[in-house]
Each structure stands twice: as structure tokens, then as C-alpha cells.
């Protein structure tokens, strides 16, 4: 996994969300968008805290970035899966692709278990 590319993708989504809220006339909410992965730290199950411009509800955004195509596989942590389950109505996965060329994105809303085929690829071993 390329951490630098991931951080660039997160920054892209922070700017995108602020811009979306400004266009909706919600300067107040745009100022509240928080890059939690940087400001608070990893481990919350999402990277960006944003808001719905209509009802002001929180949007918990996990960002997955690739320089490759739309369907290139991505990795998620158990914490991200749990967050998507526990906070399904607020959880959004932004899949940023073609980053470095013309970045584009699609959004999956709700449970990752319901939106994706999840395949275990890492196991913890104890003796």
C-alpha cells in the first residue's frame, strides 16, 4: 500500500467536500470538515468527517485511492468494516481512481459487507 498516495487522496476528498459545501452555500459546514486521519489519527474507521448540506448529519468518509482503474482491488481494515456496519447510514467509502492523471471517484454508502466482496488476506497468528 502506498501511504503517500493515500494521504494525497484523502486531501483531495477533504478539498472536494469543502468545495461541495461551499457551492451549497454552507460555509459554516465547510469550515467544520475535518481530516480526522491527520488531526486525530488513524484507527477511527474513517478518514474524513464531513456533513450533509441539507440536514447537517455527519458523513464518515473512508478514502481509498489508486493511480489505476476503477475496478482495481483495494484493502480495508477490520476497523473500517466495523465502522461501516455500526454507522452504516453515515458511512461513505470514496474510491478515488486514476489519481495522478484525471482523478475520478465513486462513492459506496453503507455497509462494506453489503457493497463489496470481502476476501480475508491477512491473519493474526499467536503461539
PLM features: residue spans?
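Protein C-terminal end segments and domain termini
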Residues: 103-127
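Acidic-basic catalytic patches of nuclease active cores, encompassing PD-(D/E)XK
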Residues: 1-32
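A short acidic/basic microdomain associated with nuclease active sites
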Residues: 20-51
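Extended, charge-rich C-terminal regions with high alpha-helical propensity
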Residues: 44-46, 56-61, 124-127
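Conserved catalytic cores of phosphodiester-cleaving nucleases, focusing on short active-site segments
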Residues: 13, 17, 48-50, 59-67
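Catalytic cores of nucleic-acid endonucleases
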Residues: 4, 56, 63-111
Amino acid at each position: 500500500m502506498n501511504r503517500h498516495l493515500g494521504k494525497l487522496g484523502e486531501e483531495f476528498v477533504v478539498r472536494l467536500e469543502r468545495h461541495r459545501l461551499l457551492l451549497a452555500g454552507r460555509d459554516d459546514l465547510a469550515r467544520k470538515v475535518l481530516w480526522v486521519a491527520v488531526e486525530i489519527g488513524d484507527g477511527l474507521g474513517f478518514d474524513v468527517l464531513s456533513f450533509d448540506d441539507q440536514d447537517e448529519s455527519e458523513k464518515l468518509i473512508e478514502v481509498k485511492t489508486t493511480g489505476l482503474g476503477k475496478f482495481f482491488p483495494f484493502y480495508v481494515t477490520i476497523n473500517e468494516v466495523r465502522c461501516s456496519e455500526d454507522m452504516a447510514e453515515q458511512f461513505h467509502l470514496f474510491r478515488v481512481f486514476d489519481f495522478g492523471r484525471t482523478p475520478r471517484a465513486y462513492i459506496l454508502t453503507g455497509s462494506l459487507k453489503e457493497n463489496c466482496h470481502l476476501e480475508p488476506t491477512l491473519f493474526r497468528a499467536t503461539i
